Curated annotation (Swiss-Prot):
<dbReference type="InterPro" id="IPR038281">
    <property type="entry name" value="RTP801-like_C_sf"/>
</dbReference>
<protein>
    <recommendedName>
        <fullName>DNA damage-inducible transcript 4-like protein</fullName>
    </recommendedName>
</protein>
<comment type="function">
    <text>Inhibits cell growth by regulating the TOR signaling pathway upstream of the tsc1-tsc2 complex and downstream of akt1.</text>
</comment>
<dbReference type="GO" id="GO:0009968">
    <property type="term" value="P:negative regulation of signal transduction"/>
</dbReference>
<comment type="similarity">
    <text>Belongs to the DDIT4 family.</text>
</comment>
<keyword id="KW-0963">Cytoplasm</keyword>
<dbReference type="GO" id="GO:0005737">
    <property type="term" value="C:cytoplasm"/>
</dbReference>
<dbReference type="InterPro" id="IPR012918">
    <property type="entry name" value="RTP801-like"/>
</dbReference>
<dbReference type="Pfam" id="PF07809">
    <property type="entry name" value="RTP801_C"/>
</dbReference>
Length: 206
């Protein structure tokens, strides 16, 4: 008598192919790696309520010189988070985006402070957000931020996030829909005044 796999395994027990077993093991291994990295925020959606609480907590720890800068800082942080969240679903096409816990708050504070001395302040900024996947290669556009659409921009600001290339290279491209991307703590700001012929000013932050 020849038994089918269903009879060998018994009634009510699902049949799992060898490929399914391998995929499941890889998924579990990937989850263990991501959960062990406690220096990074791991979210399926970086706009979850828990993530917003972490942002607010990091903002509370900042010592802003005045109330106005604090309000601008909070608003800019949320706009950067929104930009990254939208890019996660569109241009990045990843399910999980890992980033250092204070990265967005740090970037937002530097963006606000870069507007000091500008004719319209932060309201005159046109902000472009990029991702640097590899040094020397073309930057990937993630989105744009316009603090006040009613104001004609007086300066352009490029925010360049950097991809962590050590983000499990053997695993991150196995699952197209489950791709995991991780950002480094370092970033770059490039400021160009639109009313001046001066060369852009580049700041690297570690």
């Amino acid at each position: 008598m020849v038994y089918t796999p269903a009879l060998v395994l018994g009634h009510g027990i699902p049949i799992v192919s060898e490929e399914d077993n391998i995929v499941e093991l890889m998924r579990k291994f990937l989850c263990q790696i991501t959960s062990s990295d406690n220096k990074y925020v791991r979210r399926g959606s970086i706009e979850s309520s828990e993530f917003i609480k972490e942002i607010n907590s990091s903002l509370d720890s900042e010592t802003a010189p005045d109330c106005e800068e604090r309000i601008l800082h909070q608003d800019m942080t949320r706009q950067i988070v929104r930009c990254l969240s939208e890019a996660k679903e569109s241009s990045l096409r990843c399910r999980i985006l890992l980033l250092p816990r204070t990265l967005t708050a740090n970037v937002a504070l530097d963006v606000v402070r870069s507007s000091a001395g500008e004719p319209c302040g932060l309201r005159g900024a046109f902000i472009q957000v990029y991702l640097e996947t590899q040094l020397g290669q073309q930057l990937q556009m993630l989105g744009t931020i316009t603090p006040d659409p009613t104001v004609t921009p007086t300066f352009e600001l490029s925010v360049v996030f950097k991809l962590d290339k050590d983000c499990w290279p053997l695993l991150k491209h196995i699952f197209v829909t489950d791709k995991v991307l991780k950002l480094r703590p370092q970033y770059r700001l490039v400021k160009k005044k639109l009313y001046s012929s001066a060369s852009p000013v580049i700041h690297e932050f570690c």
